[in-house]
Amino acid sequence: MKNSILEELKWRGLIKQITNESKILDAQNNNDAVYCGFDPTADSLHVGHLMMIITLKRFADYNFKPIALIGGATGMIGDPSFKANERVLQTKDQVEHNINKISAQLKQIIPNVNFVNNNTWLSNISLIDFLRDIGKHFNLSYLLAKESIATRIQTGLSVTEFCYTMLQAYDFYYLYKNNNCSIQIGGSDQWGNITSGIDFISDTINKNNKAAGLTINLLTKSDGQKFGKTESGTIWLDKTKTSEYEFYQFWFNQTDQDSINLLKCLTFLTKEQIDNLIKEHQNQSSKHLLQKALASEMTKFVHQQQGLDKALKLTEAFFSGDLFSLTNDLFKMALNSLPNTQINKDTKVIDALIEVKAASSKREAREFLTNKAIMINNQIIEDENTLISSFDLIQNKYLLVKKGKKKYFVILIK
């Protein structure tokens, strides 16, 4: 473990921008609080949020008191920073539901985090008070110079969204004044909002204050694509939206280069541990040691040991073909994680492949069968006229179709 949080963040290549290094080091020595904001735009966080969740946990490991600010008020508006279009406004009930779900997720991941909801203080400010006590401290030219706002001026920016940065600035002011919170952290798009908060504190409390902030680099893949999106959509932290198995597989399927970067950015493995993994992987790359370490660390962090155990058991069952020994709970996870459909027991294999979307046409299905690329319940299938009723069923009603090395589909027999 490094001597300071800044050393830790630097060797991992995480820092994008920082306002004042010495203030952050002083805050570490004084056991100050640090906060990161999460707007409740959905009822679950996703892997794109992990960079900030893990960074908040890193600060906690270095003597800071972690605060997760849930934007009960700002979530009703939506942060315009670097967004192409204005967000669709959510109802109060939607926001409240999302807050409850997200808070439960974060509490499970970072048990010692202190939750605050900015609706607690922002809802008590009248429009007149907002204009007089907050708005007068923000010069229009100052706000328009912010890159996060300037990029939206041409496409259209409502007054509602325009005020967002002032509300977030007040959040920092409030936590600084009431929670001994001197540090705000955020993603690379939050620099303008963070510096607005520091300027507001300087203007209203004391120019010689201890407020500071830093932003974290955007996580991208080695090919330049934004990290976190897949062909099947968003990878959620909620296991009812993305199962532990799917979550594990998402990390396991990263490239070698991306795995190395992700191990540095998102895990708590030391530099020595990561360097040793890289050496071992280079000597026996077929074992995918980097990917296994990454998938295990991330799944355990989000879903605890129990979730990792489930993911590993299901992964092993798919690899070995021993699906008949799976518990009902694990097979339900497989069913929820894979494309599946109901098919009549008298259906031929060639038609079943199309129905379950393992093939787009009979011609393509025949190609797969000819090339021995189709397995049903771990048995290679070549005859297109085989009836699916001829196979032993898993739990008396399921068949598992494997296409190639990694694609799985589940057939439920009617």
From Swiss-Prot:
Q: Which residues bind ATP?
A: K229
Q: Does the keyword Cell division apply?
A: no
**Subcellular location per the Swiss-Prot or TrEMBL entry:** Cytoplasm
Q: Does the keyword 4Fe-4S apply?
A: no
Q: Which InterPro entries match?
A: aa-tRNA-synth_I_CS, aa-tRNA-synth_Ic, Rossmann-like_a/b/a_fold, S4_RNA-bd_sf, SYY-like_C, Tyr-tRNA-ligase, Tyr-tRNA-ligase_bac-type, Tyr-tRNA-ligase_bac_1
Q: For this UniProt record, give its keywords in alphabetical order, as a comma-separated list.
A: Aminoacyl-tRNA synthetase, ATP-binding, Cytoplasm, Ligase, Nucleotide-binding, Protein biosynthesis, RNA-binding
Q: Which GO terms describe its molecular function?
A: ATP binding; RNA binding; tyrosine-tRNA ligase activity
Gene3D superfamilies, A to Z: HUPs (3.40.50.620), RNA-binding S4 domain (3.10.290.10), Tyrosyl-Transfer RNA Synthetase (1.10.240.10)
Q: Which reaction does it catalyse?
A: tRNA(Tyr) + L-tyrosine + ATP = L-tyrosyl-tRNA(Tyr) + AMP + diphosphate + H(+)
Which cysteine pairs make disulfide bonds? Answer: none
Where is the motif ('KMSKS' region)?
226-230
Residues of the S4 RNA-binding domain: 347-414
Would you name any one GO CC term?
cytosol
Q: Which domain of life is it from?
A: Bacteria
Q: Which PROSITE patterns match?
A: AA_TRNA_LIGASE_I, S4
State the Gene Ontology BP annotations: tyrosyl-tRNA aminoacylation
Motif segment ('HIGH' region): 40-49
* Annotated EC: 6.1.1.1
The residues that the entry says bind L-tyrosine are Y35, Y164, Q168
What's the subunit arrangement here? Homodimer.
Q: Which family does it belong to?
A: Belongs to the class-I aminoacyl-tRNA synthetase family. TyrS type 1 subfamily.
Q: What does this protein do?
A: Catalyzes the attachment of tyrosine to tRNA(Tyr) in a two-step reaction: tyrosine is first activated by ATP to form Tyr-AMP and then transferred to the acceptor end of tRNA(Tyr).
Mind telling me what this protein is named? Tyrosine--tRNA ligase
Species for this entry? Mycoplasma mycoides subsp. mycoides SC (strain CCUG 32753 / NCTC 10114 / PG1)
Q: Which gene encodes it?
A: tyrS
